[in-house]
Amino acid sequence: MSDPVQPDSGTADALLRAVEDQQSALVELAGTLIACRTDSQSEDNPEFPSEAQRCQQIVAAWLSDLGAEVHRWHEPPHYPVVAARLPGSAAGRTLAFNGHVDVVPVGDASAWTHNPWGGEAASGRLWGRGAADMKGGVACALVAMRAIRESGIGLAGDLWAHIVADEEVVGRSTRHLLSRLPAVDAVLVAEPTALSIMPVEGGLVHFRIEIDGRESHAGNRYMSVHAGGLGGHAGVNAIEKMLRVVTALQALERQWGNLRNHPMLPAGFNTIMPGIIAGGPGGGADGKLNIVSNPGTSPNYCSVEYNLWFLPGESFPAIRDEVESLVWAVSQTDPWLREHPPRFTWKLRDIYFPPAETSPEHPFMQSLVAALEKAGQEPRIEAFTAASELAWYAEVGIPGAIFGPGRIAQAHSPDEYVDLDQLHAACSVMALAAAAWCGVASF
């Protein structure tokens, strides 16, 4: 495929005018999406299936009105997916805008001064749950597609919208979408980046370690900790055995931070953080105690759940093997652990994201840089220090970047908002980037 024809100043100006003409529609659409109560993590929100369906119906209707080819289905048990193709002339490169319409719960409603489901525009901001993360970004993508249509520009390559409703629960919609639909040549994930281009993110995995001990009355403890006692026959404290493992993994974390790095990620980003611990007598499994007793019996069960970040260029199997090998080595120095080795559960609750990395020199990155410049914004290329759906595109070899309105600091917080000027700028950049990457077939 030859390089597609790039937009000249005339087509760029036409796109910017078209986006400008859609500003009221942009704010209205984003507010309408915010008004859908799509908090997918809330156990007290039985309305999620119907609200997610309503939200995705708005998305699908918008895209259908553009003349896009719309695909809809549900991921079990109740996550609607909308994928739509704005066809090009088949001579250019293809691009997908990725976004999610599910949000995290409101939390403490008394901490909000704006209605979390109001979608209110006030003081130069759009307020509500999902304004930044990421219904604002979804609205920008949809309005950018309309602006391309309204400008009279015909793209050379197909422009897709991939909109899901299960990102906040680490669902499988995007993964299944990528196996179900034609592959695209690049993706733009519209998460909040405050208009920075973010083509890099680390890998993430959750895992659990479990250790068994032996119960005994606390009055017998002296026999297991002093020379001449009964040792393990007087009880084995699973919490203390776990401390050996926790200490070893903490040392490994420090070693990683000192010896391994990535030029775009903060030093020490690759961490191994213990986040949840459970231990006690009475036994346990899967990170849960069978009973809640008292500390008068030595604990025979302990589990620790970890959040582990690793770097682009590193593989999950290698990281897993390194962690397990270290814990095995520690176990060999302890008679009890040698005979009762720690047990691992990886990808706990399905939490796993592969790393993503697209070179700043990649042509798609250059399309984004050029789009920012044409929109009057200073290009900034940085790393994303959270996990996103970009991971699943990277896993199948699709280059891309995270780019959108809003700040990650606003996400998941009370009085979440997105600046209206960032909404406008992000929409302009998305339209310009699509034209630059897909190419212009006609105008």
Predicted region positions:
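Short amphipathic alpha-helical segments
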Residues: 80, 124-125, 159, 300-304, ...
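Acidic/His- and Gly-rich active-site-bordering loop/insert found
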Residues: 3-127, 150, 154-155, 407
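Acidic-glycine-rich active-site phosphate/pyrophosphate-binding loop
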Residues: 106-122, 202-205, 210-213, 217, ...
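Metal-dependent amide/peptide-bond hydrolase catalytic core
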Residues: 1-12, 21, 71-74, 212-443
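Short, surface-exposed alpha-helical segments at coil->helix boundaries
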Residues: 49, 53-57, 138, 320, ...
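Short glycine/proline-enriched loop/turn "hinge" motifs that connect secondary-structure elements
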Residues: 111, 153, 199-203, 295-299, ...
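Fold-level recognition of mixed alpha/beta catalytic cores in primary-metabolism enzymes, strongest
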Residues: 132, 136-253, 412-428
